[in-house]
Amino acid sequence: MNRLQVELPGLSLKNPIIPASGCFGFGREYAQFYDLSVLGSIMIKATTEQPRYGNPTPRVAETPGGMLNAIGLQNPGLDKVMNSELPWLEQFDLPIIANVAGSQAEDYVAVAKEISKAPNVHALELNISCPNVKTGGIAFGTNPEIAADLTKRVKEVSEVPVYVKLSPNVANIVEIAKAIETAGADGLTMINTLLGMRLDLKTAKPILANRTGGLSGPAIKPVAIRMVHEVSQAVNIPIIGMGGIETAEDVIEFFYAGASAVAVGTANFIDPFVCPTIIEELPALLDELGFDHISECQGRSWKQTCHSR
């Protein structure tokens, strides 16, 4: 028995560890360090219909417990991803999750329709929560009706299950999650980065050229845990949890909150081996905690509460 096997819509994962979109590129750099086939899946970098060069520099800044980024969805565009990046990834035993982005609804639909045809793309991640672009991105993810409409339109053209990436920069994330579920989403990924800023002590001006950026890393983990905990009790579709994961213990905490798999982001920049290390350490941690299979951890924090009432 594979104690780490996870079954999700469109995704049969040998383990629940997935490098997060935007922190792993298309895997080429990390393939120099280890065989990517050990991973559960890869969420590839956000893909738009046309190439994007991203925001002006500087667009990354360190913060205590994390980092700010304002990359701006830099990517080579749909044609290059379809004809170069995805074919290259076929050498690995991996179901790919393609992250889809755009400036308007029609862009999302066009990219989703084409990229979902790729033989190794088993699911889409609808990026409606990027805080670092002026159009699209987070504009779609802060309004339940708009988020639901976009989800429905993408579902109509996609040949694979659709997961929607939620923004934490909202007043009521549960309301948005439920609207997206009603619109037909197959799953959720959460959370994207928190909007933040740093100022230069000498100039008193923002360090990032974009002024603001997305905060990621361990600093946001408690927020992510709280939101996964809330949303998982309100919806009946699976959640891929993310936000500050660095260790096997972090993974179990997300599972306890209600996640069915996890994505590791910023930690990949610090330690390129973080994902295989977590995968290697999980079985011993399950033994220590008394679990036969990782699925036994899912939702344990609130399911225990329900059973005790």
Swiss-Prot record:
FMN binds at residues 21, 45-46, 99, 127, 165, 191, 217, 243-244, 265-266. The lineage of its organism: Bacteria, Bacillati, Bacillota, Bacilli, Bacillales. Substrate binds at residues 45, 69-73, 127, 192-193. GO terms for biological process: 'de novo' pyrimidine nucleobase biosynthetic process; 'de novo' UMP biosynthetic process. NCBIfam families: PRK07259.1 (NF005574), pyrD_sub1_fam (TIGR01037). Its EC number is 1.3.1.14. Binds 1 FMN per subunit. One of its GO terms (cellular component) is cytoplasm. It comes from Bacillus cereus (strain B4264). InterPro entries: Aldolase_TIM (IPR013785), DHO_dehydrogenase (IPR050074), DHOD_1B (IPR033888), Dihydroorotate_DH_1 (IPR024920), Dihydroorotate_DH_1_2 (IPR012135), Dihydroorotate_DH_cat (IPR005720), Dihydroorotate_DH_CS (IPR001295), Dihydroorotate_DH_I (IPR049622). GO terms for molecular function: dihydroorotate dehydrogenase (NAD+) activity. Pathway: Pyrimidine metabolism; UMP biosynthesis via de novo pathway; orotate from (S)-dihydroorotate (NAD(+) route): step 1/1. It holds the Pfam family DHO_dh. It is found in: Cytoplasm. Its cofactor is FMN. It is an enzyme of class 1 (oxidoreductase). The active site is at 130 (nucleophile). Catalyzes the conversion of dihydroorotate to orotate with NAD(+) as electron acceptor. This is Dihydroorotate dehydrogenase B (NAD(+)), catalytic subunit. Disulfide bonds: none annotated. Keywords: Cytoplasm, Flavoprotein, FMN, NAD, Oxidoreductase, Pyrimidine biosynthesis. It catalyses: (S)-dihydroorotate + NAD(+) = orotate + NADH + H(+). Belongs to the dihydroorotate dehydrogenase family. Type 1 subfamily. Gene3D superfamilies: Aldolase class I (3.20.20.70).
